[in-house]
Design a protein with these regions (language model features):
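Sec-dependent N-terminal signal peptides
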Residues: 4-13
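N-terminal secretory targeting modules
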Residues: 13-190, 368-372
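Serine-esterase "nucleophile elbow" of acetyl-processing enzymes
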Residues: 104-107, 147-151, 157-232, 236-246
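Structural recognition of the beta-strand scaffold that forms the well-ordered cores
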Residues: 190-193, 222-226, 249-253, 285-289, ...
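Oxyanion-hole/transition-state-stabilizing segment in secreted/luminal serine hydrolases
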Residues: 203, 215, 232-280, 291-298
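The substrate-binding groove and active-site-proximal loops of carbohydrate-active enzymes
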Residues: 255-266, 301-309, 347-354
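Substrate-gating cap/lid alpha-helix
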Residues: 294-333
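Histidine-centered active-site loop/cap adjacent to the catalytic His
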Residues: 346-372
């Protein structure tokens, strides 16, 4: 028995040493240590308290604590780089250790990564990864071939970061001798989205399946994700921060967190938010979004449907009143256009991957119409 255990321990030690040697054969890069900003999706890259935050450090004094804490989550952030590597590894830590997933959302979405690339035909391709969740989370993307016709050539990659966890540190590795070139931030104007848990990414199976990430790829332009789970409430400190961003369009998708607000209070919030944005950025379009659920969604919870319909009705009325007052450059995305049905959510609120794609397609269609 003792001999048997000794053999097992020796084999284990050899395996551990072999894995360590493989890791040593990789060249590792720390995005936070880059000579220039490389974390896309941040509106204030030089003002953040921690490298993977979404709001500037000064916002801690102006937004509610719940909003600030959620802003530490890396939802919507991604890193662009070029490489000819046939294997890419990522190792990183998150602040909520041991709490990697949620009952209605897998660890791969809450705390995981997602790697996409653009082939030489301009099409998006995706790399499945092997992952392990512990104090140090690891992802291994093997046998990468972005384009068979250009084997061994550099590919352009986008690594999407966790939706519902805060990244404390990260390193990206490629085999020694392979090329790896971080890409600078885009200088294009971003789409800026202020929303709820749905915008933050709940409950996508992986970060790249959040509707905001799908939208970013479909529009092929930068996107700032200001989605805060349970806390997308059209609050002035967030509206003021949004006006600091020279956006191509502002999106206000907060009704799911405002269904309990009395009609008059909801009217005021919508009205003041639109006026606040247009006072500072009069030429930037503002897209108002109805509640994603309604009578056509097939949900058989009468109270929930009634609340959703009521909030959307208030939004439609405010939209009409704003138009009557001569406010221009405002648009409305309807519940019907979002097209949610009985297959679209995990729990009657948060989208499945199918629901995320439905959201992204509806947004893509209307934003293209507005901007072109």
């Amino acid at each position: 028995m003792l001999k048997y255990l000794s053999v097992i321990l020796i084999c284990f030690a050899i395996t551990e040493r072999s894995e360590a040697q493989k890791a040593d054969a990789f060249t590792w890069w720390n995005p936070a240590g880059s000579a220039f900003p490389v974390i896309e999706g941040q509106a204030w890259p030089k003002e953040v308290k921690s490298p993977y935050d979404r709001l500037p450090a000064r916002a801690e004094q102006t937004v509610r604590k719940d909003v600030w804490d959620l802003s530490r989550h890396s939802a919507g952030l991604y890193i662009k780089f070029r490489s000819n590597a046939d294997e890419i590894r990522v190792r990183y830590g998150v602040t909520s250790k041991g709490n990697f997933g949620m009952p209605h959302m897998p660890a791969t979405g809450v705390s995981g990564l997602d790697l996409y690339a653009v082939n030489h035909g301009g099409e998006w391709v995706w790399a499945p990864g092997l992952y392990h969740f512990s104090d140090t989370i690891t992802y291994r993307y093997a046998n990468i071939e972005v384009d068979r016709q250009f084997k061994g050539k550099d590919g352009e990659f986008r690594l999407f970061l966790p939706l519902y966890n805060a990244v404390s540190w990260m390193e990206i590795g490629v085999p020694a001798g392979k090329t790896f070139t971080p890409m600078p931030l885009s200088d294009e104007k971003p789409v800026v989205i202020y929303g709820t848990s749905i915008a933050q990414g709940g409950c996508a199976s992986r970060p790249g399946m959040a509707w905001t990430a799908i939208l970013e790829r479909q529009l092929n332009c930068p996107l700032i994700n200001l989605g805060f789970s349970g806390n997308g409430r059209l609050e002035k400190p967030l509206i003021d921060l949004m006006t600091e961003i020279d956006a191509r369009i502002y999106v206000l998708d907060c009704l799911p967190n405002l269904v309990g607000t009395p009609d008059k209070g909801l009217e005021n919030k919508i009205w003041e938010s639109v006026k606040g944005l247009q006072a500072k950025r009069p030429s930037t379009p503002v897209l108002l979004v109805e509640h994603s659920l309604g009578a056509g969604s097939g949900i058989i919870n009468a109270k929930r449907v009634e609340d959703c319909e009521r909030s959307s009705k208030v939004l439609r009325q405010v939209f009409a009143d704003l138009k009557k007052e001569g406010i221009k450059n405002i648009y409305l995305l309807s519940n019907a256009a979002l097209g949610m049905d009985i297959n679209s959510t995990v729990d009657g609120s948060h989208p499945t991957d199918l629901g995320m794609k439905q959201h992204a397609d509806a947004y893509t269609k209307i934003i293209r119409q507005i901007l072109h």
